[in-house]
């Protein structure tokens, strides 16, 4: 019986080391299952899987940012580890290029400088010939002024002012009125005839100005004070001293040769005061004084007729006192 008691224990003792040395059999009999350990939650953060955790997001970032604390360059195996795993989830963020010295900081300045140089170099090449040859060239700047004239340069004040010198003496009795339409020239001339005696005026054929010569400088200054005045509620008139020497010289020659033409016909038709130089035209018209005398001669009072007068006798006074007449 003792032999039978020892025999069954022997194989158990011999089989126990075989079970311990076998890598495929589980440790306890109750927990023996056919599922891997990581699916059952048996992963207590072992030490051996740390080298393989480079592909993890948290450990990978730690591996990449570790050179910042160490102050050295990142290890070379880290860079190809992310390129090989194309099907795996992303290991680093899109902003890691800026924070990582090995991957982002060092190439960024070089790439930015390259981009700036590439972007700016064609701009400089394009703008330099344009600004240097076409825009700021003295020859090109002077060409448009020679070929085309601006509206200000077509103004007679611009062309006449260039011909004046410091030695020229202008007649202060001449003024230039401008800013009115051609249809209102007679109306404007009539308005300026109120400021003084107009000896002569020269109307522009195509422009909107005319030169007026007054009898005295004081009258010309009075006309100059009307610069910017509005006539007829729709016409603003400008008045400036006349600077056209040709008009002044022609006027002086005309007065010396034929003084009767000193006053032009438009002024006579507007009813301005007549001058001695206009006597040939006035002689054909009946004077106003003669017309006045002819119209009032039939209505003069005749001295022979007796006009009724009030009776101032004593009887009439007594009757007026008594009866209240």
UniProtKB/Swiss-Prot annotation:
* Cell compartments where the protein resides: Nucleus, Nuclear pore complex; Nucleus membrane
**What's a GO cellular component annotated to this UniProt protein?**
nuclear pore nuclear basket
Give the CDD domains listed for this entry. Answer: RRM_Nup53 (cd12722)
Q: Which GO terms describe its molecular function?
A: identical protein binding; nucleic acid binding; phospholipid binding; structural constituent of nuclear pore
Annotated segments matching region Disordered = 1-37, 69-94
Keywords noted in UniProt: Membrane, mRNA transport, Nuclear pore complex, Nucleus, Phosphoprotein, Protein transport, Translocation, Transport
Q: Topology in the membrane?
A: Peripheral membrane protein
Pfam families xref list: RRM_Nup35
Q: Which residues form the RRM Nup35-type domain?
A: 169-249
Point out residues bearing the modification Phosphothreonine.
Answer: 106, 128, 264, 272, 274, 279, 307
- Fill in the subunit field for this protein: Interacts with TMEM48/NDC1. Forms a complex with NUP93, NUP155, NUP205 and lamin B. The interaction with NUP93 is direct.
**Cited function:** Functions as a component of the nuclear pore complex (NPC). NPC components, collectively referred to as nucleoporins (NUPs), can play the role of both NPC structural components and of docking or interaction partners for transiently associated nuclear transport factors. May play a role in the association of MAD1 with the NPC.
The UniProt family comment states: Belongs to the Nup35 family.
PANTHER family in alphabetical order: NUCLEOPORIN NUP35
What's the name of the protein? Nucleoporin NUP35
| Protein species of origin | Rattus norvegicus (Rat)
Organism classification: Eukaryota, Metazoa, Chordata, Craniata, Vertebrata
What's the gene?
A: Nup35
